[in-house]
Design a protein with these regions (language model features):
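Acidic, glycine-rich two-metal-ion catalytic cores of nucleic acid-processing enzymes
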Residues: 191, 204-314
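N-terminal leader/targeting and assembly helices and adjacent pre-domain segments
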Residues: 1-203, 301-314
């Protein structure tokens, strides 16, 4: 592993560690949100085990929003603030490269770029908060109008937040949920997920806050990493990039074909625009690399730093 690869690996290690913490805290936040939303729903009066007071159902909307702000939006705020750690390692990596000292510090322009990127990412998390607030409030109101059994309403609310990973009464189900959230053994995880799906078959695929927030937590972090790396590289006049990262079972053909290769910006953009593959995003290679949920990184480099054999000489 040469110096450029080492710098890319350091970034990858940090980003992976930050993402793991973000997802762990998200799981906790949504578990607490689910618990509080159920508790709030239980404050509504029932008649024959059904909600019946439409006015009270409507009045619950701001209370639901307050709970989402308390648990989820607070999590999102802390998540986006931690992007500063990614920005720091990107700047620290630049200090190792043979470039002008002018580009080895955090400039006022960098701070403005970081602030704007964080604002955009936070807005994405807020969109999920708004969508979930509306979905939960609408479910309570519609259940009141239709006379839906209250226990079914509660279950729908839980699933809208956490999908199949709702807090269940059965100890076995809760143990499976905990196992999926914590195990690093993919075989064990898949068996647990399959068992959960057997119990909650209708929710195998569905819209829920956990699913979208988890995906956005990954994509936003990786997008920030890629976008700020590109900005710092452009600032320093670096227009070549090493496509870096591991290959795993579901790696896309684009990533498998390009991993370990060095491309100019134009070459990379040409490849991106001329090729199609499953999971390709609508952004660009510096934002998404191989597409949605991609874990690869682009590390700035320069052809003059290598000899005719392709060995790094800096």
């Amino acid at each position: 592993m040469d110096k450029i690869e080492e710098l890319a690996q350091l970034r990858e290690n940090l980003v992976d560690d930050i993402e793991a913490r973000h997802i762990n805290r998200l799981n906790i936040a949504l578990e607490n949100l689910e618990k509080d939303v159920v508790k709030l729903a239980n404050t509504l009066p029932l008649r024959e085990n059904k909600l019946f007071e439409a006015r009270l159902a409507v009045e619950l909307r701001p209370k639901i929003k307050a709970l989402i702000d308390k648990h989820y939006v607070l999590w999102a705020d802390g998540t986006v603030r931690e992007y500063d750690k990614v920005a720091k390692i990107i700047v620290d990596n630049m200090k190792i490269l043979p470039i002008s000292e002018n580009f080895k510090t955090l400039t006022e322009l960098d701070i403005e770029t970081i602030t704007n990127l964080k604002r955009v990412k936070f807005t994405g998390f807020l969109d999920i908060a708004t969508e979930t607030t509306n979905a939960l409030a609408d479910e309570i109101y519609q259940s009141t109008i239709s006379g839906k059994p209250f226990e079914d309403t509660v279950k729908t609310l839980q699933h809208r937040i956490n999908g199949v990973y709702i807090k269940a009464d059965q100890d076995e189900i809760n143990d499976l949920v905990e196992l999926v959230a914590t195990t690093t053994d993919e075989t064990v995880k898949q068996k647990a997920i399959d068992k959960l799906h057997t119990v909650y078959g209708a929710d195998r695929v569905g819209n829920n806050m956990r699913r979208y927030a988890k995906q956005l937590a990954h994509d936003s972090l990786m997008e920030f990493d890629g976008q700020f790396t590109k900005a710092k590289a452009a600032e320093a006049g670096l227009t070549n990039f090493l496509y870096y990262g591991d290959i795993i079972g579901d790696s896309r053909p684009f990533c498998i074909a390009n991993r370990g290769k060095i491309f100019s910006e134009d070459e990379l953009r040409d490849k991106w625009s001329s090729e199609s593959w499953k999971g390709k995003s609508t952004t660009d290679p510096f934002t998404s690399r191989g597409g949605y949920n991609c874990r690869h990184h682009l590390q700035p480099t320069d052809p003059s730093w290598y000899n005719e054999n392709g060995d790094l000489i800096i």
